[in-house]
UniProtKB/Swiss-Prot annotation:
Residues 19-34 have a biased composition (Basic and acidic residues). This is Antigenic heat-stable 120 kDa protein. It comes from the Bacteria. It is found in: Cytoplasm. InterPro entries: Rickettsia_antigen_120kDa (IPR020954). Pfam families: 120_Rick_ant (PF12574).
């Protein structure tokens, strides 16, 4: 090569860096012909060789990468060695390969396709005899692949390769007279170790370029299998420390190292193949590694950087003097120097991998081979690694079974060993060829598996490759829309099932895949949603909650940031998937709440979507509340230290908390149904269960109307009965509990609507008709018994409605008293009168007659009023309405009492509002006192450690959660305690005493304190 870079093959020898006269050229050509006509003795060993010049040189093995055009066209080739490689090796191989392809096409059943390909070959051959376009087209790989399966063709290609190497090395060797040509390496043993050798390489001027070091490795024998299934043991190989950077002297250097046989010896020259490194003079004059060439398919003995390279050639195994780590270093340097690797193994690995699944890996005692993906920037120089199946044990001869490995997986892994782009090319070619969508999906899935199983790739590279595969699937024009969905979902499923990728890294893959899908212009919204939902499913299937949260958060953010319009963003789909997942309610509540919050903030959820998601959230919260509530109920029911009365009180408190909660009436009904169902299904005695159920019914019936309307009470009561009816206990027990529920309603003075709700609960329960009829009879019997009790206590009931001052007998008594009071002055006046107008008897008779007449009218009026009050058509308030007013007043008084913080204020309240205020009926005041006494007793129980306090709840539902006892940290339960309830025990006793004293005073009140009638012994004398 001249200094100005101009090339002239007819006048310039790049190796000798000199020009020849015409006479010298003719003499040299004659010497070459004579040399080529000589035969080489097969017994002669092949030698390592090197050539040192200041000119560029390229040597190559026959390769499919060369067939694909990696070597520049003839018009651009000036290097005589490269030209010789092309003419003696590559082109003859191409000719033989095309000949076999045409034979295969002649036998192809699809005649149209066969004719199309035949014409394509013939037409291109007229333009370019190298057929670079044909061999470079991925769509033609299936034909190349099939041709290479022919054993006769393989033998021809191998013989061409061996003869070509022999020819090139002999033609351009120093021994043949070629100036500055190849010459054997003179290795010198290291003085301190027999397994180390070295040689110094110098340029034409005698300046040292580098020192090569060779190490002979004697290892414990390991076994590998050839393609035909036979086994070979390797016990010795060598490593050469090929230089990466050369900066000692100027010039070019080409190292060609012979591959060793399995026993560590050199093959004969007629079977030799070589690993060659080409160092070309760089801009600064120093040699730069620009190209390497190696025999066909190159494999490595393991996954570590110290794994030795090997090939199978001519049915024999050969080891090369380069390790995996050194090979990668050299490839990176080639890329850095913008060189070109003419590497048969890379391209042929891909082609052979497509059609020959029987390609077997090398197996070592300590490690297995595996696919390897180099960083993308080195993708054109990535060494091919054939994947492995099961490793052999040390010193064990075991033949790998090809049927144990998925052939397609070998194909994808082999393609991936070249580069990610090679894998995508292979996949796309397969997608184009495959008509069956199932085969297309299988191919995509196998590619994803190969990526994730590649042990040489770090996690970042795996992520990048998975994303590239997903993007390739979305954008592939040969896939139908539904197939794209299935293909991407197959990639997602592969991510899900991969056992080696950490969960947090999986979540990143999901996030990136969703971003590709949502931002794609090649998908419809329906298809995008299907892929999005699959990604969410995979994210929710991750093994730990942190990874699941990371996955959903990442997907959520991608959805919000996607290029879709706000109304088209599919965040609701994420929420729906979370809602129907099998996660715990607590985790679903957390995830769904996060999605809803973010969606509202980003304004990507419509009002209807927000409402729907909020409903889902409420339902999840209700489910969790139900679960927690049932646990508390079970703890109470199975507490051996509490009696039925205490169990009832505690479950009443739980029931009250449910009724006071923020959930809808329907949800409250579901929880109450679960409570009664749990009670009914417990192992308690039937009478005890009925007593507890009665307490539940009473709590519902007496609950404040301000937080629970009458229709909602009825709905919840129906649910309570449904829980009883659908329990798995026997029918007599259910009948008894139904009676208990009805008794609780009457005890709580519930109206007819509440009682009727019990029948509704029976009707809506999932039991047979005979059981429904039996439960209704039990309900009716309980109602009749309660009505009988009410009839017997009717008078007491009237007292409770504040009508005692208006009873007829009281009015008659008062009017009689008025008569006496009116008559006495008349009598006294008559006695003093000296001139009486009429006699006293007449006057008394007249007055008495008038008074009695008035009394009669008043009695009739009172009786009529009494009848009107009892009449269903009367205009007066009904008994139920007056009861409700009384209950409401009691609640108001109790609430007002609760606002008093000190004992003195509470005592003053009792005197002012309960003892002195006679405008309130006795019944209201007494009920208020009873309710306040109940609260004081609860407060006492809380303060007194000797009193059972587990699961006590204040009806108000506004308490703070505090531990039961600091002395018992093992107790997990908690109690709800209102701050004011934690009073001093002495003050508590004072209040209870004041309440009981007030109760006695109210109960002893006279119905009327008017003066008794003054009785005379005889009428006055006239």
């Amino acid at each position: 090569m001249s200094k100005d870079g101009n090339l002239d093959t007819s006048e310039f020898d790049p190796l000798a860096n000199k020009e020849y006269t015409e006479e010298q050229k003719q003499t040299l050509e004659q010497e070459q012909k004579e040399f080529l006509s000589q035969t080489t003795t097969p017994a002669l060993e092949a030698d390592d060789g090197f050539i040192v010049t200041s000119a560029s040189f390229a040597q190559s093995t026959p390769s499919m990468s060369a067939l694909s055009g990696n070597i520049s066209p003839d018009s651009q080739t000036s290097d005589p060695i490269t030209k010789a490689v092309r003419e003696t090796i590559i082109q003859p191989q191409k000719d033989n390969l095309i000949e076999q392809i045409l034979k295969d096409l002649a036998a192809l059943t699809d005649r149209d396709l066969a004719e199309q390909k035949r014409k394509e070959i013939e037409e291109e051959k007229e333009k370019d005899k190298t057929l670079s376009t044909f061999f470079g087209n991925p769509a033609n790989r299936e034909f190349i692949d099939k041709a290479l399966e022919n054993p006769e063709l393989k033998k021809k290609l191998e013989s061409i390769e061996i003869a070509g190497y022999k020819n090139v090395h002999n033609t351009f060797s120093a021994a043949s007279g070629y100036p500055g040509g190849f010459k054997p390496v003179q290795w010198e043993n290291h003085v301190s170790a027999n397994d180390l050798r070295a040689t110094v390489v110098k340029n034409d001027a005698g300046d040292e370029l580098c020192t090569l070091n060779e190490t002979t490795v004697k290892t414990k024998p390991f076994t590998l299998a050839k393609q035909d299934g036979t086994q070979v043991q390797i016990s010795s190989y060598r490593e050469i420390d090929f230089p990466i950077k050369l900066d000692k002297a100027d010039g070019s250097m080409h190292l060609s190292m012979v591959a060793l046989k399995a026993d560590g010896t050199k093959p004969s020259k007629d079977k030799a193949v070589y690993f060659t490194a080409h160092y070309e003079e760089g801009p600064n004059g120093k040699p730069q590694l620009k190209e390497i060439s190696s025999p066909k398919p190159l494999k490595f003995a393991g996954t570590g950087d110290d794994a030795i390279a090997y090939i199978e050639h001519g049915g024999e195994i050969y080891t090369l003097a380069v390790t995996r780590g050194k090979y990668k270093e050299m490839m990176k340097e080639v890329e850095l120097n913008q060189g070109q690797s003419v590497d048969l193994s890379q391209a042929e690995d891909i082609i052979i991998g497509q059609g020959q699944s029987k390609e077997q890996p090398l197996i070592t005692p300590q490690q297995t081979t595996s696919s390897s993906v180099e960083p993308p920037q080195y993708k054109q120089q990535v060494p091919p690694i054939t994947p492995t199946n099961q490793p052999l044990q040390p010193e064990t001869s075991q033949m790998p079974q090809s049927q144990q490995v998925n052939p397609n997986l070998l194909n994808t892994a082999t393609a991936l060993s070249g580069s990610m782009q090679d894998l995508l090319n292979y996949v796309n070619a397969g997608l184009t060829k495959a008509i069956d969508s199932n085969k297309q999906i299988d191919l995509i899935k196998e590619a994803a598996t190969a990526i994730l199983n590649n042990e040489k790739s770090d996690i970042a590279e795996k992520q990048a490759n998975i994303i590239a595969l997903a993007e390739n699937t979305v954008n592939n024009k040969n896939l139908k829309p539904d197939a794209k969905v299935t293909g991407v979902n197959a990639v997602l499923e592969t991510i899900k099932n991969d056992q080696n990728t950490p969960n947090l890294e999986k979540s990143k893959m999901l996030e990136a895949t969703v971003a590709i899908v949502l931002n794609s212009e090649n998908l419809e919204p329906k298809q995008k949603q299907q892929m999005l939902e699959k990604a969410v499913d995979v994210g929710l299937s991750l093994k730990d909650d942190a990874s699941r949260a990371a996955a959903i958060d990442g997907i959520k953010d991608v959805v919000i940031k996607s290029n879709l319009s706000p109304e088209d963003k599919m965040l609701i789909a994420v929420g729906d998937k979370v809602n129907v997942s099998e996660l715990s309610n607590a985790e679903k509540q957390k995830l769904l709440g996060s999605v809803l919050k973010k969606g509202v903030e980003a304004q990507v959820l419509s009002p209807a979507q927000q409402q729907l998601m909020q409903q889902h959230l409420y339902k999840i919260m209700a489910e969790q509340t139900k679960k927690d509530t049932i646990k508390k109920v079970n703890d109470i029911l199975f507490d051996p230290l509490s009696n039925t009365e205490l169990k009832t009180t505690n479950i009443q408190a739980i029931t009250s908390n449910v009724l006071d909660g923020p959930a809808t009436a329907e949800v409250k009904g579901e929880i109450i149904q679960a409570i009664t169902n749990t009670i009914a299904g417990s192992s308690l005695e039937a009478q005890d269960k009925a007593a507890i159920i009665k307490g539940v019914g009473e709590t519902i019936a007496t609950h404040s109307d301000t937080s629970l309307s009458l229709p909602n009470k009825a709905l919840i009561m129906a649910s309570a009965e449904k829980g009883i009816a659908e329990s798995q206990t026997n029918l007599p027990d259910r009948e008894l509990m139904t009676k208990g529920l009805v008794d609780g309603i009457y005890e709580g003075k519930g109206g007819p609507e509440i009682t009727k709700a019990v029948s509704s609960g029976i009707d809506n329960s999932n039991i047979n008709d005979s059981e429904k009829e039996a439960l209704k009879k039990a309900k009716d019997a309980a109602s009749e018994a309660a009505l009988d009790r009410d009839t017997q206590n009717l008078t007491e009931g009237f007292k409770g409605q504040n009508i005692e001052e208006h009873k007829p007998h009281d009015d008659i008594y008062n009017k009689a008293r008025e008569v006496i009071n009116a008559v006495n002055p008349v009598i006294e006046a008559l006695e003093k009168s000296k001139e009486p107008v009429v006699s006293a008897e007449e006057r008394i008779v007249q007055e008495t007659s008038s008074i009695l007449n008035n009394i009669s009218k008043l009695a009739v009026e009172k009786v009529n009023n009494f009848r009107a009050m009892l009449s269903p058509n009367g205009n007066l308030k009904t008994l139920e309405e007056k009861k409700e007013e009384a209950i409401k007043k009691v609640d108001e008084l109790v609430k007002a009492f609760g606002t008093k913080s000190s004992t003195e204020e509470q005592q003053s309240f009792i005197k002012t509002n309960l003892i002195d205020d006679k405008t309130l009926s006795k019944e209201v005041r007494l009920q208020t006192i009873d309710k306040l006494l109940q609260e004081q007793k609860r407060s006492e129980a809380i303060e007194n450690p000797s009193v059972k306090t587990e699961d006590v709840r204040v009806v108000s539902g506004k308490s703070k959660l505090k531990p039961i006892s600091k002395d018992n940290p093992d107790i997990e339960k908690a109690k709800m305690v209102v701050g004011r309830d934690r009073v001093n025990i002495k003050g508590n006793i004072k209040i209870m005493g004041a309440l009981m004293n007030a109760r006695d005073i109210i109960q002893s009140e006279n119905l009327n304190k008017s003066t008794p009638i003054k009785r005379e012994s005889s009428p006055p004398q006239r």
